[in-house]
Regions:
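Cap/lid and interdomain-hinge subdomains that line or gate substrate/regulatory clefts
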Residues: 139, 143, 166, 173, ...
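Short, surface-exposed recognition loops or helix-turn segments adjacent to catalytic cores
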Residues: 162-173, 190, 261-268
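TRNA-binding/sensing appendages of the translation machinery
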Residues: 1-88, 145
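Positively charged, Gly/Ser-enriched RNA/tRNA-binding surfaces
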Residues: 2, 28-40, 52, 87-99, ...
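Beta-rich nucleic-acid/ligand-interaction surfaces
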Residues: 47-65, 168-178, 267-276
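Acidic, His- and aromatic-enriched active-site or binding-groove loops in soluble protein domains
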Residues: 67-75, 181-205
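Hydrophobic mid-domain F-helix/FG-region of cytochrome P450s
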Residues: 150-158, 171-180
């Protein structure tokens, strides 16, 4: 290949083509996930790839405004963003629905690409397909159980096994620090220690360092973690959160006894707008997070609505899946009866038509990965 040819075929770092095998897997995963969401009552919506930046923070308390592509709309001269997360868009759509209705739980699903200027350690790709569900105005415990269970069902449908649910409490450390009335500077120091889970440094935090270190040390298998957390003297709001987590774990175990549950009470990376309950989904078969979600607040005309969501990222799925295209492929020689092709396709055959005038070219059939060849009106296995 000439140097000129090499230059024009380069793609930006973290931006990739999906070739035949991965493209098939991507389509299969998309269709199967969305069908599973639909069967659980989630209705699909399709927000645009780009919209006004002001919409991004209108309904959620906190969003990731740093890692985002920005442009200016040449028509309105207003700043716009290329989405790096679809959840804020679903929050916008849900807000319109909640404004028009009362006493109704809203279930929405979505799928689409997101684009990020910089990849992360967990997700180095910059263009990723994201699929997910959002549940609004359901009680937090039953809502969390429904969303997590729906995610487990969907991933099981696409043959991802050995699932692990890692439950976190993004707001737990904040509850402890607020109760201790720490200064802003001490809170920032504490958050930096918690982020890297430096137990010795956490212990040095005045007033609440001992409690925070015990919370950090409780991480692990859910029964062990909950047992340790229940021994800690926590403020009422924190105790209520621990009780809710315990109920969620019990219900998930009943619904999905083969799924492992762990608890990491101080983990909050990637849970920007989540509060209360958060979770991530892993498989022991792949070293990458498959999905994440949790509880958040939707602000609408001064009223707060409870949201519970799940986002599944395809970079991890495409590494985890072993799905193959097993659809039958039949090689059609140059001279054939055209009337038979429609019937073959109707019966699920992929037809590969030869442009080679040779009568029965079995070698050519193998090149196109055909398992069968058409001989007259009969299909013969190669």
């Amino acid at each position: 290949m000439k140097n000129y040819d090499k230059k024009i075929t380069l793609l930006p770092r973290g931006i990739n083509d999906l070739l035949e095998k991965k493209s098939f897997q991507d389509s299969f995963l998309s269709q199967t996930l969305m069908n599973s969401f639909k069967l659980n009552g989630y209705e699909k919506v399709n927000p645009p790839m780009i919209e006004f930046e002001e919409n991004y923070t209108l309904f959620l308390d906190t969003t990731n405004k740093q890692n985002i592509f920005r442009i200016v709309d040449p028509i309105s001269n207003k700043p716009m963003y290329i989405r790096n997360d679809i959840t804020p868009q679903i929050a916008r759509i849900a807000a319109n629905k909640l404004y028009k209705t009362t006493d109704k739980v809203i279930r929405l699903s979505y799928i689409g690409d997101v684009l990020r200027p910089i990849g992360s350690q967990l997700h180095p790709e910059r263009q990723i397909k994201q699929a997910g569900i959002e549940l609004y105005d359901a009680p937090n415990v039953s809502g969390a159980v429904e969303v997590i269970s729906t995610g487990i069902q969907a991933l099981t449908e696409i043959e991802i096994s050995n699932l692990i649910i890692d439950i976190t409490m993004p707001n737990l450390a904040n509850l402890i620090m607020d109760n201790a009335k720490l200064s802003g500077q001490l809170i920032q120091s504490a958050k930096s220690y918690l982020k890297v889970k430096n137990i010795n440094k956490i212990k040095t935090i005045p007033t609440c360092g001992k409690i925070l270190s015990k919370i950090a040390d409780s991480a692990g298998e859910n029964e062990r973690a909950l047992s340790k957390l229940n021994l800690i003297d926590l403020p009422p709001k924190a105790k209520k959160l621990i009780k809710d987590i315990s109920l969620i774990c019990d219900k998930i175990k009943i619904l999905h006894p083969n799924v492992k549950i762990t608890i990491d009470p101080i983990e909050n990376r990637g849970f920007n707008y989540y509060s209360g309950i958060g979770f991530a989904i892993f498989s022991s078969n792949v070293k990458r997070e498959l999905g994440f979600g949790g509880e958040y607040t939707l602000n609408l005309n001064g009223k707060k609505h409870n949201g519970m969501g799940l986002s599944i990222l395809f970079d991890g799925l495409l590494r985890a899946t072993q799905i193959k295209d097993n659809q039958k492929r039949v090689f059609i020689p140059y001279k054939h009866k055209t009337s038979i092709l429609a019937e073959l396709r109707k019966n699920g055959w992929i037809t590969i038509i030869s442009h080679n005038k040779k009568a029965l070219n079995k070698e050519e059939a193998k090149i196109y990965n055909c398992s069968h060849i058409l001989n007259g009106t009969k299909i013969e296995e190669l």
